[in-house]
């Protein structure tokens, strides 16, 4: 997306621990590679624990300034506590991060007038929309709050986030051009990316979206900030 690597923090599985943390096939495990983009430099910095997610967000909230853009991207498992109408993100070692907790952790960014853009691919991710919208986020989720999300057929990606990422890049994983810039103005906004992803999502899921205010999602892109 043209974001400098120094501005990206990766929180994933067991972090830099060399122990096995990913299942390749039945009974076969290995340690996740730290270099995710094959440039020879490690990308994963932290294990996906509550303490580390909170630390990274806290550090960023101190560094970022008014009108900066925070992109919060989740590819993970998720769950729901139906009787409490709560959704959560599954973290490492059976920890979890609930919708209302994430809203609290993101609130300092909005208090500094920082744009927050959250794309959530986990099951039951739609349960985060209400809480995050209430604090002023742009939110796109793979599914409704009481429904699972699904992987792609035939390629190792999750369906919604694959389509969303293709929209942002204007190319898919096979280097085919993607017509996601609807108004041909040289930028794919969060609103346009969601519409493309929802339209091309082939799984049995209903992606959700909201922006507060609506105009932010219509203008916010990785190469454009709302005026």
Please describe what each predicted stretch is.
Residues 22-44, 85-87, 176-190, 212-220, ...:
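Acidic, glycine-anchored loop motifs typical of Ca2+
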Residues 1-13, 19-28, 53:
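N-terminal carbohydrate-binding/catalytic regions of secreted carbohydrate-active enzymes
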Residues 1-8, 66-71, 111-117, 133-138:
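Loop/turn elements at helix/coil->beta-strand transitions in domains of secreted/extracellular proteins
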Residues 21-23, 82-87, 129-132, 151-152:
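Short, solvent-exposed loop/turn and secondary-structure capping segments
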Residues 24-54, 63-65, 75-110:
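A short, glycine/acidic-enriched catalytic loop
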Residues 3, 48, 52-59, 97, ...:
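Extracytoplasmic/secreted proteins, especially bacterial periplasmic and envelope-associated proteins
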Residues 5, 14-18, 76-82, 94-96, ...:
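Solvent-exposed loop/turn segments at secondary-structure junctions
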Residues 116-212:
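Active-site-proximal C-terminal subdomain of hydrolase catalytic domains
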């Amino acid at each position: 997306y043209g974001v400098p690597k120094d501005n990206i923090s990766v929180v994933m599985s067991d972090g830099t621990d060399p122990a096995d943390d990913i299942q390749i096939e039945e009974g076969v495990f290995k340690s996740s590679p730290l270099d995710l983009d094959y440039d020879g430099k490690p990308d994963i910095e932290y294990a996906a624990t509550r303490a580390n997610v909170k630390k990274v967000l806290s550090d960023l909230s101190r560094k970022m300034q008014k009108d900066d853009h925070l992109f919060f991207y989740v590819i993970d498992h998720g769950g729901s506590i139906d009787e409490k109408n709560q959704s959560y993100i599954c973290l490492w070692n059976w920890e979890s991060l609930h919708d209302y907790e994430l809203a609290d952790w993101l609130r300092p960014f909005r208090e500094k007038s920082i744009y927050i853009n959250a794309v959530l691919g986990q099951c039951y991710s739609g349960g985060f929309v209400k809480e995050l919208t209430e604090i002023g986020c742009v939110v796109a989720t793979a599914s409704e709050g009481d429904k699972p999300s699904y992987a792609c057929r035939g390629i190792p990606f999750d369906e919604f986030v694959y389509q969303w990422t293709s929209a942002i890049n204007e190319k898919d994983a096979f280097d085919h051009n993607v017509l996601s810039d609807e108004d041909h103005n040289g930028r794919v906004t969060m609103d346009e990316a969601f519409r493309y992803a929802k339209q091309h999502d082939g799984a049995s899921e209903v992606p959700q979206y909201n922006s507060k205010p609506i105009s932010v999602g219509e203008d916010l892109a990785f190469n454009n900030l709302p005026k």
